[in-house]
């Protein structure tokens, strides 16, 4: 974890202190270790996220220590808990306000599939309104599972180019907009 990760990218090494490579690999490395999370907590998964951010698990080791409470200053949203149909347009609006490139982690059974709340008022999976990058299983998931999701997202950021990421997200959003016209507020 560090500059030694750059040695896995195409380029030349000049001694121990200098690494030559392309700019995109440096940007991908930097972006993967400087995520600004926006926790959207509505249930018990939010409590597990709080313990993940505290000293016992220390999410700061992975570069996501600064939670942002303004979507305009965040690039990763963690959906933690049950999302109702009344909340869905608000969540989508928050996602649209986030800085590019933006990432989504669906934490827990309620956010991923509606959980035990299979009712008319609960959205059966946040992937119906947002392009989810990583799913975290559990009810509630343990802090280790949330950290594992963060590591999976970092791996994805290191391997996927910026343009490929942009195209993937735009395609997912277009599909979501076509499927869920009543949920999307513009």
Curated annotation (Swiss-Prot):
E.C. no: 7.1.1.-
A Pfam match: Oxidored_q6
Major site of localization recorded for this protein: membrane
Required cofactor names: [4Fe-4S] cluster
EC main group: translocase
An example Gene Ontology molecular-function term: NADH:ubiquinone reductase (non-electrogenic) activity
Gene3D superfamilies in the record: 3.40.50.12280
Membrane topology: Peripheral membrane protein
GO cellular component: plasma membrane; respiratory chain complex I
GO biological process, one term: aerobic respiration
Keyword line: 4Fe-4S, Cell inner membrane, Cell membrane, Iron, Iron-sulfur, Membrane, Metal-binding, NAD, Quinone, Translocase, Transport, Ubiquinone
PROSITE patterns linked: COMPLEX1_20K
Compartments in which it is found: Cell inner membrane
Keyword field contains Cell inner membrane: yes
Cofactor note: Binds 1 [4Fe-4S] cluster.
Sites where the protein binds [4Fe-4S] cluster: 44-45, 110, 139
PANTHER family registered for this protein in UniProt: NADH DEHYDROGENASE, NADH DEHYDROGENASE [UBIQUINONE] IRON-SULFUR PROTEIN 7, MITOCHONDRIAL
Recorded family membership: Belongs to the complex I 20 kDa subunit family.
Assembly mode: NDH-1 is composed of 14 different subunits. Subunits NuoB, C, D, E, F, and G constitute the peripheral sector of the complex.
Function, as annotated: NDH-1 shuttles electrons from NADH, via FMN and iron-sulfur (Fe-S) centers, to quinones in the respiratory chain. The immediate electron acceptor for the enzyme in this species is believed to be ubiquinone. Couples the redox reaction to proton translocation (for every two electrons transferred, four hydrogen ions are translocated across the cytoplasmic membrane), and thus conserves the redox energy in a proton gradient.
The protein's name: NADH-quinone oxidoreductase subunit B
Annotated organism of origin: Leptospira interrogans serogroup Icterohaemorrhagiae serovar Lai (strain 56601)
Lineage, broadest ranks: Bacteria, Pseudomonadati, Spirochaetota, Spirochaetia, Leptospirales
């Amino acid at each position: 974890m560090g500059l030694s990760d750059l040695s896995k990218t195409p380029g030349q090494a000049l001694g121990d202190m200098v690494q030559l490579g392309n700019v995109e690999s440096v940007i991908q490395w930097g972006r993967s270790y400087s995520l600004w999370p926006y926790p959207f907590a509505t249930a018990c998964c939010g409590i597990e996220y709080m313990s993940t951010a505290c000293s016992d698990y220390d999410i700061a080791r992975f570069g996501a220590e600064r939670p942002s409470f303004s979507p305009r200053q965040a690039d990763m949203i963690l959906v933690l808990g049950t999302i109702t149909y009344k909340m869905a347009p608000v969540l989508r609006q928050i996602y649209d306000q986030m800085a590019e490139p933006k990432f989504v982690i669906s934490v827990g059974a309620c956010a991923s599939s509606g959980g035990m709340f299979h009712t008319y008022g609960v959205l059966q999976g946040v992937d119906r309104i947002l392009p989810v990058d990583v799913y975290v299983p559990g009810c509630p998931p343990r802090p280790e599972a949330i950290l594992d999701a963060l590591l999976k997202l970092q791996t994805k950021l290191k391997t996927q180019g910026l343009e490929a990421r942009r195209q993937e997200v735009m395609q997912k959003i277009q599909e979501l907009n076509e499927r869920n016209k009543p949920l999307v507020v513009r």
